[in-house]
UniProtKB/Swiss-Prot annotation:
Taxonomic lineage from the root: Eukaryota, Metazoa, Chordata, Craniata, Vertebrata
Top-rank lineage group of the source organism: Eukaryota
GO cellular component, one term: haptoglobin-hemoglobin complex
Alphabetical keyword list: Heme, Iron, Metal-binding, Oxygen transport, Transport
Its job: This is a larval (tadpole) beta-globin.
Oligomeric and partner information: Heterotetramer of two alpha chains and two beta chains.
Protein name: Hemoglobin larval subunit beta-1
Globin domain: residues covered: 3-147
GO biological process, one term: hydrogen peroxide catabolic process
Record-linked CDD domains: Hb-beta-like
Family: Belongs to the globin family.
Tissue: Red blood cells.
UniProt keyword annotation of Repressor present: no
Length: 147
């Protein structure tokens, strides 16, 4: 797993303190579903996802985006044990939901875009490097149930 220094943990927590779990989760999931439309197949129960307006205005997209970022929030509280913390969620996505684990990386990538847009100049290269390292650990932990 990924080892984070004290400075990296501090940067991750500083970024996360500025996140609005509901709004930023909605933005990240909306971006995922628009930019990577094939991911919509995992959300067939969400109803109309036919265009940007439908996705953006979908209450189930908003609720699931909040759920996703709530899991990220909890993971940040378990930085030293993300793999074990996310083991049940990883197994669920692998065995029950059959989500392609590449989509965890895609979601991590769109979350970086949302965070960069939100933080602007405060999302420095050093902050991004710490966040990317955390994201890699998160993706690895979520993918663990597949292998």
């Amino acid at each position: 797993m990924v080892h984070l220094s004290a400075d990296e943990k501090s940067a991750i927590n500083a970024v996360w303190s500025k996140v609005n779990i509901e709004n930023d989760g909605h933005d990240a999931l909306t971006r995922l579903l628009v930019v990577f439309p094939w991911t919509q197949r995992y959300f067939s129960s969400f109803g109309n996802l036919s265009n940007v307006a439908a996705i953006s205005g979908n209450a189930k997209v908003r609720a699931h985006g909040k759920k996703v970022l709530s899991a990220v929030d909890e993971s940040i509280h378990h930085l030293d044990d993300i793999k074990n913390f996310l083991s049940v969620l990883s197994t669920k996505h692998a065995e029950e939901l059959h989500v392609d684990p590449e989509n965890f990386k895609r979601l991590a990538d769109v979350l970086v875009i949302v965070l960069a847009g939100k933080l602007g100049a405060a999302f420095t290269p050093q902050v991004q490097a710490a966040w990317e390292k955390f994201s890699a650990g998160l993706v690895a932990a979520l993918s663990h149930g597949y292998f």
